Swiss-Prot record:
Belongs to the HSP15 family. GO terms for biological process: cellular response to heat. Residues 98-131 are annotated as: Disordered. InterPro entries: HSP15 (IPR025708), S4_RNA-bd (IPR002942), S4_RNA-bd_sf (IPR036986). Residues 6-67 form the S4 RNA-binding domain. It comes from Haemophilus influenzae (strain ATCC 51907 / DSM 11121 / KW20 / Rd). This is Heat shock protein 15 homolog.
Length: 131
């Protein structure tokens, strides 16, 4: 028995990477989705065992297609359609850790500046413009 054919945009929607098929289509067309290390078209028929690279915001995921589905199900069932590679998980964790540590090193004020402090800040920022 032959497996059913599923389009790339429909599979991404069914696997819950994108909320709508039109968003999935837009991401594929803009080059944020690569199928087996090549830019893909929306109507590409996906195969079990293929590798996908997805860019979502600051994150880049590498996933392997394990199963096919053209119906959107709950999140636990959708996660059974793919498996993220170990290197991808590790890379995303390192980036998240670096982003977290970077934000911790920046000083954050305890409170908002009052009126006098705001004026002083504005003077300081614009002091070269008036000289």
């Amino acid at each position: 028995m032959a497996e059913k054919e599923v389009r790339l945009d429909k599979w991404l929607w069914a696997a819950r990477f994108y909320k709508t098929r039109s968003i999935a289509k837009a991401m594929i067309e803009s080059g944020k989705v690569h199928y087996n290390n090549q830019r893909a078209k929306v109507s590409k028929i996906v195969e079990v065992g293929a590798m996908l690279k997805l860019r979502q915001g600051n994150e880049e995921k590498e996933i392997k297609i394990i199963a096919l589905s053209d119906q959107r199900r709950g999140a636990p069932e959708a996660q059974l359609l793919y498996q993220e590679t170990e290197s991808s998980v590790k890379k995303r964790e390192e980036i998240a850790w670096a982003r977290k540590n970077n934000s911790l090193s920046m000083p954050h004020p305890d409170r908002r500046p009052n009126k006098k402090e705001r004026r002083d800040l504005l003077k300081f920022k614009h002091q070269d413009k008036f000289e």
